[in-house]
Amino acid sequence: MCRFKSGIIFKSRCVVAPGENDSHSDLLREMNIEDTYTNASRLFVRAELVPKNNEWWTDPDGWEFVVDQDVTPDWYDTDPGKYEEEFRQAVKAWWDKHVIVDKKIDELSSGFYRLKRCKVKKLLNDVKVYLDRSTVGEMCGRSTVGEMWGSSTVGKMRDSSTVGKMWGRSTVGKMWDSSTVGEMWGSSTVGEMWGSSTVGKMRNSSTARDFKNYPNVKIHIPKGGKFELVEHEEEKPCD
């Protein structure tokens, strides 16, 4: 199983898997290299730099180096330490560009990013992000949140913006136009759905409120789930 962060070591260079796909096989296919035993023994080394406890926001200098194949080329075996260091530097360069921690950002409009404890005002165009305890004010265009973890929030989704998976206590405030949420897990919530917005699969105790026929409001819950409607009682003012 390929793990974050994967790449391929060649005799003269290292290639780190772009974006969120850490499959060695897919990366080799993109480079038109057959993923065979013979090629693994001559041309390349499948490698990974793996953060402890999957804490991808920590400094890669402390991550574990892993060779993900049984056979390695002779050129690698003559100086494995050299190639490990070259791969570490390549992953560190990728991490510096694509992992953002504890930042306030006006907008992201292209590329792929993993965000930890960040606040972003807008996601635009075809940017794709993964959120962990991060906040996005508004998503527009074809912007995508691959996954939301922890208490991550998205305020508004517009146009054809997409959230792949919501976990934990993650929240989407309002969905408009043709925006979509693929899967909801844990106690994740969608506050309001408008227009032709959609939610694909719902699991656990996730909920979504459908305002498309307002003032008639539908509450979506997972199939087989239980939902209790309780009338809110306002506190009486003190005399």
What residue spans do the PLM features occupy?
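Short, glycine-biased loop/turn motifs at secondary-structure junctions and
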Residues: M1-D239
